[in-house]
Amino acid sequence: MSTSIIVTGAGGRMGSTICRMAQEDPVLTLAAVVERPERLASLDVWKCPSGSDPDAVFATVPGGVVVDFTSPEASMANARAAARAGVSHVIGTTGLTAEQKAELADLARTARIFWAPNMSIGVNVLLKILPQLVQQLGEQYDLEMVELHHNRKKDSPSGTALRLAECLAEARGWNLPDVANYHREGIIGERPKDEIGIQTIRGGDVVGVHTIYAMGPGERIEITHQAHSRENFAQGALRAAKWLPQQQPGTLYSMLDML
């Protein structure tokens, strides 16, 4: 049975990748696309209905799944529209505030919503194994992270970096906002033990690199995840689009639920 998907932000880099891969997938149908009015003409290549009003477009695809890599504000508007239309909603947008995440969780009580700041299978497997690593190493190991992305990325640190850092903090029994350090400069004194440094690099066309450091007496462990193309994230999002309609509303689903 084919799953009908609606791609929002279809004129963007992620959106166009998702459209192409959806059309190549035998069990998916690209049913509609959504974009800003000034970009609609560029969507003719997909040969499917298009529009700029999420409410109007979503209503034309009953039982469909919205796949959304846009902006925090657009994704929240899309989430409300998807809930009104009764369609499922897969969100890969990063940079959501705590308030926006709370609203998604509230909407998910009666709607099917899936949100992951990183749709990569590898990153989400990493989220599963990091707690065991951190707990077995013990608190004598300092935890740091460096993330690298292209020069057009708007949020910093990346949503993936923050989720990985949350995972590290939770494994230590810490609250990330209390221990995260995003900036070091000048005479800052010795490094506190209860700290996680998160550093950001931006440049070129780098899709995404995240390196976690665990540094202890006489040794250092480095774990790096490197995304080579956006197809990695698109594949995870389309896998979620096939999975989500089979689930019941009531919780904000994530990659860890699907895996």
Curated annotation (Swiss-Prot):
GO terms for cellular component: cytoplasm. It is found in: Cytoplasm. NADP(+) binds at R36. It catalyses: (S)-2,3,4,5-tetrahydrodipicolinate + NAD(+) + H2O = (2S,4S)-4-hydroxy-2,3,4,5-tetrahydrodipicolinate + NADH + H(+); (S)-2,3,4,5-tetrahydrodipicolinate + NADP(+) + H2O = (2S,4S)-4-hydroxy-2,3,4,5-tetrahydrodipicolinate + NADPH + H(+). One of its GO terms (molecular function) is NAD binding. SUPFAM superfamilies: Glyceraldehyde-3-phosphate dehydrogenase-like, C-terminal domain, NAD(P)-binding Rossmann-fold domains. (S)-2,3,4,5-tetrahydrodipicolinate binds at H150, G159, T160. Keywords: Amino-acid biosynthesis, Cytoplasm, Diaminopimelate biosynthesis, Lysine biosynthesis, NAD, NADP, Oxidoreductase. The active site is at H149 (proton donor/acceptor), K153 (proton donor). One of its GO terms (biological process) is lysine biosynthetic process via diaminopimelate. Coiled coil: none annotated. Its EC number is 1.17.1.8. NAD(+) binds at G9, A10, G11, G12, R13, M14, E35, G92, T93, T94, A116, P117, N118, M119. Pathway: Amino-acid biosynthesis; L-lysine biosynthesis via DAP pathway; (S)-tetrahydrodipicolinate from L-aspartate: step 4/4. Its main location: cytoplasm. The keyword Nucleotidyltransferase does not apply. Catalyzes the conversion of 4-hydroxy-tetrahydrodipicolinate (HTPA) to tetrahydrodipicolinate. Belongs to the DapB family. This is 4-hydroxy-tetrahydrodipicolinate reductase. The gene is dapB.
